Design a protein with these regions (language model features):
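An N-terminal-biased, well-structured beta-alpha scaffold segment characteristic
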Residues: 2-7, 11-112, 239, 349
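Hydrophobic Val/Ile/Leu positions in short beta-strands of Rossmann-like dinucleotide-binding domains
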Residues: 24, 169-171
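Short beta->alpha connector loops at strand-helix junctions that form conserved
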Residues: 51, 91-92, 109-120, 196, ...
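Rossmann-like adenosine-cofactor binding region
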Residues: 63, 80, 193, 197-293
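Phosphate-binding beta-alpha-beta segment of Rossmann-like dinucleotide-binding domains, i.e.
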Residues: 109, 114-168, 334
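Rossmann-like dinucleotide-binding domain for NAD(H)/NADP(H)
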Residues: 111-112, 240, 249-349
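Glycine-rich Rossmann-fold phosphate-binding loop(s) that bind the pyrophosphate
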Residues: 174-175
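N-terminal Rossmann-fold NAD(P) dinucleotide-binding loop
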Residues: 178-179
């Protein structure tokens, strides 16, 4: 049965039973705009939208909640306050700000995220950053708006321009987004290599991607693109020693999480000409400091953590948590479970 059908399926006696309570934290006047409230109500849920961001108000509202739709900032304090919650759904891929997973497991709470909603958007943005860096789109556009045209007027607005055909892009991580980046890169006749110790060799072969160790990817690639979640083991995965392995004309791309890259080391590498440039949708501290040296460098493109944005994805990221909560509260397994070990403690079809 499809997830939408499962979510709307209720028993004949549901009306006589106490409706499960679903609390939505942070509706900010918009919850229900894309049908997410209807999804929950069709599943027999009573929906409470909490506009307050005050912790005392949140803790009071969620105490008797059966389900929760929340930002991906799940603290032990919040999870401790849940007396009978069965499911928490968040509208993000990354869950690096969740510190109450073990407690949720103990309490039998399923935590859901949306790992497959933004795949195409982030992959497309990665290629957009690559092309913007290679073609020097931002400084050239600005040069033109200021009255320049090409190299006339005595000012050269750009450095040399790569011809990307036949060059190599190296992917750090080979999950869903990275595989779509590989597919798109191959469309530009780029060679693709990737590092991911958790992915079987067959997945690389099937995608026509050369599997390699991290050091080899860094050494051999003209473009290095980061696609790993932020975990204790990936914090500053790309640091000073890794940047030192890269080619002097290489470009670093990051559409994953800012702290995966040691930002001071990256700034140093760019200032010293150790690498050619960078395309970043994320920074180590967000929002980015207006005085951050990265923002002053013509060989760096920075966008405001918006790689996942599109009209479709924006609506789907709001509907999906509702479907996931509805699925669990009607006894069905959700599509994406962040803490899969909890499934051993709960009974879901």
């Amino acid at each position: 049965m499809a997830i939408a059908e499962r979510a709307s399926a209720t028993t004949n006696g549901a009306a006589q039973m106490t409706k499960p309570k679903v609390v939505v934290i942070g509706g900010w006047g918009r919850f229900g705009d894309v049908g997410e409230k209807d999804i929950l109500e069709r599943a027999g849920c009573d929906v409470v939208v909490l506009e307050s961001r005050e912790e005392k108000d949140i803790l009071a509202a969620v105490k008797d909640a059966d389900g929760l739709i929340a930002p991906p900032v799940l603290t032990k304090t919040l999870i401790s306050a849940l007396d009978k919650c069965k499911v928490i759904a968040c509208s993000s891929i990354g869950m690096d700000k969740v510190d109450g997973v073990e407690l949720a497991n103990e309490k039998g709470i399923v935590i859901c995220n949306v790992p497959d909603v933004f795949i195409d958007e982030v992959a497309n943005h990665t290629l957009a950053l690559l092309l913007a860096c290679v073609r020097w789109i931002v400084p050239v556009a600005q040069h033109t708006k200021e009255g320049g045209w090409g190299q006339r007027g005595g000012r050269r607005p750009v450095g040399y321009i790569h011809r990307i055909t036949g060059e190599t892009i190296g992917l750090i991580g080979f999950g869903n987004i990275s595989r779509q980046v590989a597919k798109r890169a191959q469309g530009f006749d780029l060679k693709v290599m990737a590092y991911d110790p958790y992915v079987p060799a067959e997945a690389f072969r099937a995608a026509g991607v050369r599997q390699a160790q991290l050091a080899q990817v860094l050494q051999d690639s003209d473009f290095v693109s980061v696609h790993v979640p932020l975990l204790p083991g990936t914090h500053h995965l790309i640091g000073r020693s890794q940047l030192a392995l890269m080619k002097k004309d290489a470009i670093l791309l990051n559409t994953a999480r800012g702290p995966v890259v040691d930002e001071p080391a990256l700034i140093e590498a760019l200032q010293n000409g150790q690498i050619l440039g960078a395309g970043l949708d994320v920074t180590e501290h967000e929002p980015v400091d207006p005085n951050n040296p990265l923002l002053q460098m013509p060989n760096v493109v920075v966008t405001p953590h918006m790689a996942s944005a599109s009209d479709w994805a924006g609506a789907e990221r709001r509907r999906r948590p509702a479907y996931e909560v509805a699925a669990v509260l009607t006894g069905h397994r959700p599509r994406a479970v962040w803490n899969p070990s909890v499934l051993e403690k709960v009974s879901l079809k």
